[in-house]
Amino acid sequence: SISIDQKTTSRNPRSTVGTVTEIYDYFRVLFARIGTPYSPETGKEIKSMSVQEIVDEFYKFKKKQKFYLISPVVNNRKGEFKKEIAEFIKKGFMRFRIDGEVCDSSNIPQLDKKKNHSIDIIVDRIEVDKKYESRIAQSIETAISLSDGVIYFYDVVEQKNFIFSSK
């Protein structure tokens, strides 16, 4: 049952019954819950996956195909991020992708604090081969924990990201 509060209305010509009664927000939540989201780029269903499901999807790529397993930690935000990068280096991560460029911990570029930056940690360099299955699963768990649930498999040859989410 839905109740609508009676009150004075604003006279905005773009108002609808949904926006005036503020029921529009509830409909958005309702349709977001019952709907199935699809990626506008690939047309595939967007869903959360377990580590094992991500591993299974990884093995659908061609055998011997090479990937970087990437954990996005800063997504298009302003700042220098010196402390964050130093903390990741202290934890043992040596390779990064900063603003699309792969770099080593020894040659991190100086970031302009007034510009937006994207920083990804390259957690592992892997190839599609069953003998690496346990290592891949551990690396995926590590990547998920660093990035709040989103990881990329970056195809080194095609230079394309394949995005997976555990949320």
Please give the residue ranges for each predicted region.
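Conserved phosphate-binding elements of NTP-dependent enzyme cores
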Residues: 1-167
